């Protein structure tokens, strides 16, 4: 049974919400749900966060999660070039015991991030060796492996802010390092959302038609947003990517009615990222359908505007003929932000985007659209509209 099938989405979101609250809410959580189930959920989350191990010698790290008189023991096999995975207690040498109180581990994983360098957990090296001579004999074989293996497991037991560029490389996404250099921009614009219980929708799961590829970007966002729920939309079936806090949806980003339906079901979203087909008409359809489902204060991101110049993607080689492209959309958003400054026209009324866009940040091949109430008021009509009259009015009549 996978984490995705054992833990339904509503339960996971409820656990995350309560874990970020007051101690009374943590108590409510452990009364509302079976502690054994919570323990399994936490281990599934930890395994998804652990970096690649560096130890050459296989070793087991025992993760013990304690709640009152109950003790839930999980043995994790750690070795280089393999994912960390649960095994039986007799399937290797236990190099380290790591013990957490259930509520402490809930806070470490799903609470609002806080630095607690000490006093969070208990540890014991070579916990099941009772003979000192035997322990000395094992030092040469397992000491380094226990250290490196424990480091990898503990890295998955917290919510310290990761480096997005490193995550992009770990999960093999094109957002940094060879085709693009987006991660510094993402870090700048996403950092304030990191500790929130965000809902992120990314269009384009990756891997194209390959039945086993894709999902790297979704895993990157899952790691970056430790309390977030990540959705991925793709024209192909990418359900093999589904796991705890990641859900994929199959569908066409150029189908406005479909986009509206999924947004009503899974939104509103804090962040939408369009890294889909990059066909210009698709980009514009998706924005029109999904921007209304971004919450106030949220972001809509468009990647890969280079296709605006490529006719094979519905683009225009001449920048002056860009009205139907992704860049044409972005250029129109500047007027939308400034709509209250446009000359009065009885035949024109502000649209939804005009009233709900407050910022636009455009970089090489990636743009961030800020949503909010765009109603600060234009310059009053009694302010002169020509320079000389403005100077005279502002000079108190002085000449």
Curated annotation (Swiss-Prot):
It catalyses: mycinamicin VI + S-adenosyl-L-methionine = mycinamicin III + S-adenosyl-L-homocysteine + H(+). GO terms for biological process: antibiotic biosynthetic process; methylation; protein homotetramerization. It is an enzyme of class 2 (transferase). Mg(2+) binds at residues 275, 303-304. Keywords: Antibiotic biosynthesis, Magnesium, Metal-binding, Methyltransferase, S-adenosyl-L-methionine, Transferase. One of its GO terms (molecular function) is O-methyltransferase activity. Pfam families: MycE_N (PF17843). Disruption phenotype: No production of mycinamicin II and accumulation of mycinamicin VI. S-adenosyl-L-methionine binds at residues 173, 202-208, 217, 234, 252-253, 275. Its cofactor is Mg(2+). The active site is at residue 278. InterPro entries: MycE_N (IPR040800), SAM-dependent_MTases_sf (IPR029063). Belongs to the methyltransferase OleY/MycE family. This is Mycinamicin VI 2''-O-methyltransferase. The gene is mycE.
